């Protein structure tokens, strides 16, 4: 009862819930000369970019992930950490082994270069999208195609943002 009255008296959730982050990370970016990025990650990101074939109209849709997580100043490592973990979810999709290899290399390579130590409870990663109830086989097939197209759009945007964020980090290091 005290908890309920506290929330209603002050009109806000308990302050402790607002101030505590879900998970924070300390990252120490290794390979600051850019060699590992240029020779391994960049090559694999470009290969993945070329493997994803779709119209550019999906680039106008900005998924919520990018509204919540961005490569702002002093948040680059945190963004890359989250983005790499998001890439791991795509490994569960029905994709070619070559595609999985490149995706795994980018995800694992980024996490290795970031060298992050997580301070927080591990959370189960959310699924790529929620399951939709099926009405008939034809609608189900088209919705699966649409879901796959949306996932590939998201992946394409995510790869571009990862590349941009790495370039931002390397430019900042070279300027200092």
From Swiss-Prot:
Name the domain of life: Eukaryota
Q: Which residues are glycosylated?
A: 94, 115, 140
Annotated region (Disordered), positions in chain: 118-143
Question: Got any disulfides in this one, which pairs?
Answer: 27-165, 58-153, 71-116
UniProt keyword terms in alphabetical order:
Cytokine, Disulfide bond, Glycoprotein, Growth factor, Secreted, Signal
Molecular function per GO: cytokine activity; growth factor activity; interleukin-7 receptor binding
Any one Gene Ontology BP term: positive regulation of T cell differentiation
Looking up InterPro entries in the UniProt record yields:
IL-7, IL-7/IL-9_CS, IL7_sf
Q: Which residues form the signal peptide?
A: 1-25
Q: What is its main location?
A: secreted
Main function: Hematopoietic cytokine that plays an essential role in the development, expansion, and survival of naive and memory T-cells and B-cells thereby regulating the number of mature lymphocytes and maintaining lymphoid homeostasis. Mechanistically, exerts its biological effects through a receptor composed of IL7RA subunit and the cytokine receptor common subunit gamma/CSF2RG.
Description of how the protein assembles with itself and partners? Interacts with IL7R and CSF2RG.
Which family is this sequence assigned to? Answer: Belongs to the IL-7/IL-9 family.
Protein name, as recorded: Interleukin-7
Native source organism of the sequence: Bos taurus
